[in-house]
């Protein structure tokens, strides 16, 4: 028995270690965003404002509760609260990654916490189809019992064993883990401590390149190399210098990695808009380009028009846009390869410009607002950002129409390829399959590719490298407002019903200006056009990244973004941490006097900062250093002291960490999914060893 208790104690400690790594981002257990209740929940009536349940969910939970046939009132009340925790706005954290579970993490730090109360009240009470069966935890064994009705003591040997399986620590100032204690979880509004993120005094830059690029992607092999591309359709492979080395980046523009300019239609609105390298590029050599093509000049370019009968749109009735017929220009995602150009894809210095396969093709009704960024998410799927298609204020309200792929975030599986017959049967737009948990599958009135909707022209999205459930996208506004959104599964971001937080009144009579899904998600950040360009009122947001490099410790944890016109940059802070509540500040930026390449001062003198021209995009290398891709060159964020900026966290006696040579990955924290996998393996091995010890 002593050995058994020791084993249980060890398992409890391991569980605490796992739980300490979780976050409290407002997210439902099904990965959707909590919504404001438009109607009172009759059963789970404790959740009155924002929740993860609608009336249908509420009824299902009530029916499940009634079927348990619990005779004791105290036990019954606790079981009701546990079932209703599915409606909690923090249920994504309460249930971890298991949406199928009916039991959240139960608070278990003291005898007054829910797990102890539940055992005391319910241990000898019969529960039909008990949600506490060990078999529901996956692989655990339990004493012989009826599968229909059982008590806790039928299923578990002791309170300790039960609470080890279902319990977790209560939240404290040092422990931000969420557990369920019988009531709706409150947001953490405790005062910031000295380690919390603060707004930096400013941003210090150095110029390391003269090229004008639209996209930057770190080499998937984890080295100090990165890919850069321009709008006409060329991709280069460059080498990023060490911080404090005084060297510019190495890139030979006379020898591109790949040149697809003959496939790309390029002008001010069109071109190569995005590129993505497969997470296993170093092994399989697969990479992808998102661009526009002209079907008049390229016969192989043609695809289905986004203006079609399914969305009540007739392309023959659309007016010409700048003299161009509707759907002459297409949005294309094509796959290419670096295989066969060197001994391994990781060492390849050139790729092949011939298309391996066409992943996606869609005709554009107008010539503006077509997005085009692509990136691989931490889940391994390819995300494609599409604009609303242009026209006068989203003429046909495509962004709110779930039969249209315009104004959306699409999520595609490019590892499982369908047959030609499957593409036709499913009505796909190319060679890809649909991830199983995409939110709009199984309904003929909704496109299964859609991950999120209600966007006007998303321009630069990124996942937080430390918290993969934070997927932020900047969305370019029309007349008034630029915004940043946290993208979640099935989220609706309002356009054209709203422009940012403002109700939008379109000039076009086409399409109902009301979403069939009234649960809209509003921006976490944004700014009015007049804030950045008071004379003309012009603005165009450029989405950025959470700063996760050690180079500037005073910027660590902030979300950085900017405006196209290069005279405004913001640092946003989330407070409390993992709450989804952000505040931002305009921050000054300057160029280091010892920059490897000279920075030209903006009009108004050195105090006005460097003349960046236009900011096209941000980039992030494998050391998490942030780069600005501008019309005047490539700039990198460096140590604050190089611009005489005060930062108490900076160690000025030691230079920043060295970059990683080609082929060597930098040491980075494991993502949460990897930590959980490692924990599971470690736990199983530990249990096995303890079991073998008991046999001795």
Curated annotation (Swiss-Prot):
Annotated lipid attachment (GPI-anchor amidated serine): 672
Cofactor needs: pyrroloquinoline quinone
Signal sequence segment: 1-24
Subcellular location: Cell membrane
The protein's name in its UniProt record: HIPL2 protein
Transmembrane segments: none
Glycosylation sites: 38, 69, 74, 108, 124, 148, 175, 339, 431, 513, 519, 528, 581, 651
Molecular function via GO: oxidoreductase activity
Family affiliation: Belongs to the PQQ oxidoreductase GdhB family.
Chief site of localization: membrane
Cysteine pairings via disulfide bonds: none
Domain of life of the organism encoding this protein: Eukaryota
Keywords: Cell membrane, Glycoprotein, GPI-anchor, Lipoprotein, Membrane, Oxidoreductase, PQQ, Signal
InterPro entries reported in the protein's UniProt record: 6-blade_b-propeller_TolB-like, Glc/Sorbosone_DH, Quinoprot_gluc/sorb_DH_b-prop
Native organism: Arabidopsis thaliana (Mouse-ear cress)
Membrane-topology descriptor: Lipid-anchor; GPI-anchor
Gene3D superfamilies xref list: TolB, C-terminal domain
Maturation-removed propeptide residues: 673-696
GO cellular component, one term: plasma membrane
């Amino acid at each position: 028995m002593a050995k058994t208790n020791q084993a249980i104690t060890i398992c409890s400690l391991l569980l605490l270690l796992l739980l300490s790594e979780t976050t409290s981002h407002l997210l439902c257990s099904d990965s959707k965003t909590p919504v404001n209740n438009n109607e009172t929940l009759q059963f789970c009536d404790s959740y009155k404002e924002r929740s993860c349940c609608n009336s249908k969910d509420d009824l299902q939970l009530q029916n499940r509760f009634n079927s348990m046939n619990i005779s004791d009132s105290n036990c019954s009340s606790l079981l009701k609260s546990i079932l209703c925790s599915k409606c909690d706005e923090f249920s994504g954290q309460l249930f971890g990654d298991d949406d199928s579970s009916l039991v959240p993490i139960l608070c278990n730090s003291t005898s007054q916490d829910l797990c102890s109360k539940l055992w005391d009240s319910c241990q000898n009470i019969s529960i039909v189809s008990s949600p506490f069966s060990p078999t529901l935890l996956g692989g655990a064994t339990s004493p012989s019992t009826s599968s229909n009705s059982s008590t806790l003591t039928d299923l578990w040997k002791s309170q300790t064993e039960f609470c080890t399986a279902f319990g977790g620590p209560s939240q404290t100032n040092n422990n931000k883990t969420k557990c369920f204690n019988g009531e709706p979880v409150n947001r953490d509004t405790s005062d910031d401590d000295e380690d919390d993120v603060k707004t930096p005094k400013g941003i210090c830059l150095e110029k390391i390149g003269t090229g004008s690029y639209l996209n930057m992607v770190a080499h998937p092999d984890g080295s100090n190399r990165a890919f850069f591309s321009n709008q006409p359709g060329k991709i280069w492979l460059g080498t990023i210098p060490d911080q404090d080395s005084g060297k510019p980046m190495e890139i030979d523009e006379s020898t591109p990695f790949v040149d697809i300019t003959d496939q790309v239609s390029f002008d001010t609105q069109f071109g190569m808009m995005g590129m993505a390298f497969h997470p296993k590029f170093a092994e399989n050599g697969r990479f992808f380009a998102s661009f526009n093509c002209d079907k008049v000049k390229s016969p192989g370019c043609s695809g289905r028009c986004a203006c079609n009968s399914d969305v009540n749109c007739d392309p023959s009735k659309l007016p010409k846009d700048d003299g161009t017929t509707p759907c002459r220009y297409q949005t294309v995602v094509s796959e290419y390869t670096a295989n066969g150009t060197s001994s391994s894809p990781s060492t390849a210095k050139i790729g092949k410009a011939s298309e391996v396969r066409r992943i996606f093709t869609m005709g554009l009704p107008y010539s503006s607002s077509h997005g085009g960024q692509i990136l691989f998410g931490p889940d391994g799927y390819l995300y494609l950002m599409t604009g609303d298609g242009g026209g006068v204020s989203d003429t046909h309200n495509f962004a709110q129409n779930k039969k249209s792929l315009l104004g959306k975030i699409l999520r595609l599986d490019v590892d499982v390829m369908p047959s030609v017959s499957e593409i036709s049967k499913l009505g796909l737009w190319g060679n890809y399959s649909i991830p199983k948990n995409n939110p709009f599958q199984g309904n003929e009135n909704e496109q299964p590719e859609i991950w999120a909707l209600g966007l006007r022209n998303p321009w630069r999205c990124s996942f937080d490298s430390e918290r993969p459930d934070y997927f932020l996208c900047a969305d370019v506004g029309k007349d008034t407002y630029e915004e940043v959104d946290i993208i979640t599964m099935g989220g609706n971001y309002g356009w054209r019903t709203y422009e940012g937080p403002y109700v939008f009144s379109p000039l076009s009579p086409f399409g109902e200006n009301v979403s069939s899904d009234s649960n809209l998600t509003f921006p976490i950040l944004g700014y009015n056009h007049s804030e950045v360009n008071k004379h003309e009122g012009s603005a165009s947001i450029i989405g950025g990244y959470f700063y996760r490099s050690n180079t500037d410790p005073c910027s660590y944890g902030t979300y950085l973004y900017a405006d196209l016109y290069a005279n405004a940059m913001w640092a946003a802070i989330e407070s409390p941490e993992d709450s989804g509540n952000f505040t931002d500040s305009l921050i000054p930026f300057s160029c280091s006097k010892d920059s490897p390449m000279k920075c030209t001062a903006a009009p108004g003198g050195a105090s006005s900062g460097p003349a960046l021209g236009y900011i096209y995009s941000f980039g992030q290398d494998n050391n998490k250093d942030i780069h600005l891709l501008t019309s005047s060159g490539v700039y990198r964020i460096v140590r604050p002291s190089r611009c005489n900026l005060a930062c108490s966290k900076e160690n000025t006696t030691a230079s920043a960490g060295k970059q990683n040579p080609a082929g060597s990955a930098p040491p980075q924290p494991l993502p949460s999914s990897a930590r959980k996998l490692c924990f599971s393996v470690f736990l199983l091995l530990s249990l096995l060893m303890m079991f073998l010890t008991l046999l001795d």
